[in-house]
Structures are given as structure tokens and as C-alpha cells.
């Protein structure tokens, strides 16, 4: 029997449950089911949720649309964690409602950083030499 390793990714069940929880959180936030002035003023995206192996902890990566007011939004989500957990429990049929944690989604920042790197003069110079060779059918 194979032992799980540190590099092993989430199981198919973890991924499936994470997607259900993500949809439930996004639905609650988009419908405005939580009575919070900060949350009602922002459109919040939930691009990813990661589940613990025992499915008792869900880490939701969230970002207000436009990237504005991240700290107040995260604080509001933390304040409303219990109510949000109850709403998720109503929508997702699990033995235990997962405890919710909220983290800032950094994928957009990382993508922008990579884009800046690819557009840098040094990289363009390196790519320029390869593109000349690749574009020449006789080379």
C-alpha cells in the first residue's frame, strides 16, 4: 500500500467537496444572505476553497472585486464565520459542517508578477533570439 506523501495533492473527494463549499459560499455572498454592511457593499469572488483531508476545515481564498478594501472584507468574513458556516451546512450535505477560514487570494497578484517578468526587457531580449530562429523555416 502506498503511503501518502507531502507532495501528494488533494484527493478527488476533497476537490469535489471543496467545489461544493466554494459554490455555497459564493451563493451566500452573492445573494446577500449575511446582514453585514461591509459585505453588502462589495462583490466578493471565491476562486478557490481547499479542504483538509478529514473535510472538517475549509480554507476559502477570497478577493473583493477590483482588489479594493481587502482587510475590511476579510474582517467582515471572520465576524460572520459562524452564520456563513450554518448557510454552507444547509447547502452542502456533509456529516460535519466544515470550519471556515478565509485567506486573501493571491493568484491575481502572482499572475501579474509573472506577466511583468515576461514583459521585462531581459526576457524579451532572450525570447527575441528564439523567436527569430523559430520563425525561419530554413533554420
Swiss-Prot record:
Protein known as: Ribosome-binding factor A
A Pfam family recorded for this sequence: RBFA
Organism for this UniProt entry: Methylobacterium sp. (strain 4-46)
InterPro entries: KH_dom-like_a/b, RbfA, RbfA_dom_sf, Ribosome-bd_factorA_CS
Keywords: Cytoplasm, Ribosome biogenesis
Keyword Cytoplasm in record: yes
Main location: cytoplasm
Recorded GO CC terms: cytosol
Function comment: One of several proteins that assist in the late maturation steps of the functional core of the 30S ribosomal subunit. Associates with free 30S ribosomal subunits (but not with 30S subunits that are part of 70S ribosomes or polysomes). Required for efficient processing of 16S rRNA. May interact with the 5'-terminal helix region of 16S rRNA.
UniProt similarity note: Belongs to the RbfA family.
Coiled coil regions in record: none
Subunit structure of this chain's protein: Monomer. Binds 30S ribosomal subunits, but not 50S ribosomal subunits or 70S ribosomes.
A single BP term in Gene Ontology: maturation of SSU-rRNA
Key word Cytoplasm present: yes
UniProt GO molecular function: ribosomal small subunit binding
Cellular localisation: Cytoplasm
Amino acid at each position: 500500500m502506498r503511503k501518502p506523501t507531502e507532495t501528494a495533492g488533494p484527493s478527488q473527494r476533497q476537490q469535489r467537496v471543496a467545489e461544493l463549499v466554494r459554490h455555497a459560499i459564493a451563493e451566500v455572498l452573492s445573494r446577500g444572505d449575511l446582514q453585514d454592511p461591509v459585505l453588502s457593499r462589495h462583490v466578493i469572488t471565491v476562486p478557490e476553497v481547499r479542504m483538509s483531508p478529514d473535510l472538517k476545515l475549509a480554507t476559502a481564498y477570497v478577493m473583493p472585486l477590483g482588489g479594493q478594501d481587502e482587510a475590511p472584507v476579510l474582517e467582515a468574513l471572520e465576524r460572520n464565520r459562524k452564520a456563513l458556516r450554518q448557510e454552507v451546512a444547509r447547502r452542502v450535505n456533509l456529516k460535519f459542517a466544515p470550519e471556515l477560514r478565509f485567506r486573501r487570494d493571491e493568484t491575481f497578484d502572482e499572475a501579474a508578477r509573472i506577466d511583468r517578468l515576461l514583459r521585462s526587457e531581459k526576457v524579451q531580449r532572450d525570447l527575441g533570439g528564439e523567436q527569430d530562429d523559430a520563425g525561419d523555416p530554413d533554420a
